[in-house]
Curated annotation (Swiss-Prot):
It comes from Lactococcus lactis subsp. cremoris (strain MG1363). It comes from the Bacteria. GO terms for biological process: translation. HAMAP family: Ribosomal_uL30_B. InterPro entries: Ribo_uL30_ferredoxin-like_sf, Ribosomal_uL30_bac-type, Ribosomal_uL30_CS, Ribosomal_uL30_ferredoxin-like. CDD domains: Ribosomal_L30. The gene is rpmD. One of its GO terms (cellular component) is cytosolic large ribosomal subunit. It holds the Pfam family Ribosomal_L30. This is Large ribosomal subunit protein uL30.
Length: 59
């Protein structure tokens, strides 16, 4: 599977708890923090649920 780079660009403050937990589960903390993950269906589903908070690109 391809690797994807996920960057937190908008704050999870004021979002529903499930979205905040998803941000933490992906390993994102502060704004502009990035992680590289495998593009598995589970990770892609998590990214899709918080797509308005993150920027995704190929790593």
């Amino acid at each position: 599977m391809a690797q994807i780079k996920i960057t937190l660009v908008n704050s999870p403050i004021g979002r529903i708890p499930a979205q905040r937990k998803t941000v933490k589960a992906l390993g994102l903390g502060k704004l502009n923090s990035s992680v590289v993950k495998e593009g598995s269906p589970a990770i892609l589903g998590m990214v899709n649920s918080i797509s308005h908070l993150v920027k995704v690109e190929e790593a």
